[in-house]
Amino acid sequence: MKRTVKSIVAILLALIFVFALASCNTVDKTGVWENATYRKDMEFGDGSKTVVVEIKAEENLVTFTIQTANDTVGDALIEHDLISGDDGPYGLYIKKVNGITADYDVDRSYWAFYIDGEYAMTGVDTTKITEGVTYKLEYVKE
């Protein structure tokens, strides 16, 4: 009886360990991720609006869940120093996301912005936050 209980407990602990590892989305510190500020899913802020932003570079992806009082996706990301760039004639030209730099003039790389899987027709600085929508910034190198 004791042996059976110990076996069951050992199996349960092993399963818990496996599920815990699987639920931790952590990216290795290689390639463009070498300079990344965060390499695992993170939560930020305490505002009334929720913004979910996926950051994809190379084959890796992390998700940021941001609670904010801001109205735009860009302001929510800037509030937590998750993006930076240059103001241009079409709005904010994002050069850095999560510490990862993309500069088209240097190596033909840039950050593409998606709203629920569709390429965005607006920039992050003008895109209003919509609850339940997933936004994505993807590192693209031509």
Language-model-derived ranges and their functions:
Residues 2-13, 18-142:
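Ubiquitin-like/PB1-type beta-grasp interaction modules and other compact soluble beta-rich domains
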